Design a protein with these regions (language model features):
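Exported/periplasmic ABC-transporter solute-binding proteins
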Residues: 3, 21, 26-78, 82-85, ...
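Bacterial N-terminal signal peptides
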Residues: 12-20
Length: 293
């Protein structure tokens, strides 16, 4: 081997070693970036109507941020507001405004509206009714109307299926469908799935469900989703407030959010989540033409 060739090989080896050193440094930097990214655990609890969307958002968010954990729990809007107020949850999911919940300091909570949801009265198919006036609906739920034949339906006794008192769905339905009047005594179910099952199995049953529950169209089988005053519960009718039984979906925090909580709320309102909001039967905030307090 000539002296010239030897010098060339030494130079080539030096270049290769230097490149290896820098490659190693780059690899270490990438690893450190992943380790020092967003991390921590939070809990979002409350509304079962919002839970399907919150569950999906949690999954997508943690896929993007593997160091973060978002635990989503139900329990109803009242439970969510109580838990975020006490600090046992970082986010309180609610169908109702915090000011409408007794026993908490609503002024300590920050409202984050993430979408809109509609609700509808539903009956067993055998009731043979597809539309009611608002006054008929109130009459049924307050116990003044006791048989479906009184509103043009079948000769079947009406059975009322209520939701638990902690339910934001119940509070919203009472406020906007029943004008604040309390329902008569009836059966009580604590979840949308239970309501669907009991209404389908009980001739003459009536209750109410979030429209997002029908993102799976098969769940409508065996049920009539009622028009009210001739107005159907559709996205178009809700965005213009033509159909009145709807509410904002709130994600309350105790004061200003930080860290994982803040990042998760930002993600909930991102363009990426908008398609999921629509797909799951909710309405993006930006699509609303009407507002309410």
């Amino acid at each position: 081997m000539t002296r010239k060739n030897l010098k060339f090989m030494v130079a080539a080896l030096a270049v290769a070693m230097t490149a290896g050193i820098f490659t190693g440094c780059a690899g270490k930097s990438t690893s450190e970036t992943k380790q020092t990214g967003l991390s921590g655990s939070i809990t979002a609890s409350g509304s079962t109507a919002l839970q399907p969307l919150a569950d999906l958002a949690s999954q997508k968010f943690t896929d993007k941020n593997p160091g973060a954990t978002v635990s989503v729990q139900g329990g109803g809007s009242g439970t969510g507001l109580t838990q975020v107020s006490s600090g046992s949850s970082q986010i309180g999911n609610s169908d109702i405004y915090a000011k409408d919940k007794t026993g908490i300091d609503a002024t300590a909570l920050k409202d984050n509206k993430v979408c809109v949801i509609g609700f509808a009265a539903v009956t067993n198919k055998k009731a043979n009714v597809t539309s009611l006036t608002k006054q008929q609906l109130i009459g049924i739920f307050t116990g003044k109307i006791k048989n479906w034949k009184e509103v043009g339906g079948a000769d079947i006794k009406i059975t009322i299926i209520n939701r638990a008192k902690s339910s934001g769905t119940r509070a919203t339905f009472i406020k906007y469908a029943l004008d604040g009047k309390q329902e008569a005594a009836g059966l009580t179910e604590d979840s949308s799935g239970a309501v669907e099952k009991v209404v389908k199995q009980t001739d003459g049953a009536i209750s109410y469900l979030a429209l997002s529950y029908f993102a799976d169209a098969t769940k409508k089988e065996g049920l009539n989703v009622l028009k009210i005053d001739g107005v159907e519960a559709t996205t178009a009718n809700i965005t213009t407030d033509k159909y009145k039984i709807w509410s904002y979906e709130h994600m309350y925090t105790k004061g200003e959010s930080t860290g994982v909580t803040k990042a998760f709320l930002t993600y909930m309102l991102s363009d990426e989540m908008k398609a999921s909001i629509v797909k799951l039967g909710y309405i993006p905030m930006a699509d609303m033409k009407a507002t309410r307090d």
